[in-house]
Swiss-Prot record:
Entry keyword annotation includes Disulfide bond: yes
Phylogenetic placement of the source organism: Eukaryota, Viridiplantae, Streptophyta, Embryophyta, Tracheophyta
Tissues where this protein is expressed: Present in seeds, cotyledons and leaves. Not found in roots or stems.
Keyword Disulfide bond among record annotations: yes
InterPro entries from the UniProt entry: Scorpion_toxin-like_sf
Keywords, alphabetical: Antibiotic, Antimicrobial, Disulfide bond, Fungicide, Plant defense
Protein family membership: Belongs to the DEFL family. Protease inhibitor I18 (RTI/MTI-2) subfamily.
Record Pfam families: Gamma-thionin (PF00304)
Role of this protein: Has antibacterial activity against the Gram-positive bacterium S.aureus and the Gram-negative bacteria E.coli and P.syringae. Does not have antibacterial activity against the phytopathogenic bacteria R.solanacearum, Rhataybacter sp and Erwinia sp. Does not inhibit trypsin, chymotrypsin or alpha-amylases.
Protein name: Defensin-like protein 2
GO BP annotations, alphabetical order: defense response to bacterium; defense response to fungus; killing of cells of another organism
Species of origin: Vigna unguiculata (Cowpea)
Lineage: superkingdom: Eukaryota
SUPFAM superfamilies listed in its UniProt record: Scorpion toxin-like
C-alpha cells in the first residue's frame, strides 16, 4: 500500500517532477503537488 505525507517547510509546489525529485532525495518513493495550496506530498510504503 502507498501512503502520502505532506512535506512541511518546502513552500509552494509548482512542478510535480521537482517535488518527486526532492522526495526521492530524502528516501521517499516519489511525490507530487496536491491540494488548493499546492504543497508537495511524498509517497512512501505503509
Amino acid at each position: 500500500k502507498t501512503c502520502m505525507t505532506k512535506k512541511e517547510g518546502w513552500g509552494r509546489c509548482l512542478i510535480d517532477t521537482t517535488c518527486a525529485h526532492s522526495c526521492r532525495k530524502y528516501g521517499y518513493m516519489g511525490g507530487k503537488c496536491q491540494g488548493i495550496t499546492r504543497r508537495c506530498y511524498c509517497l512512501l510504503n505503509c
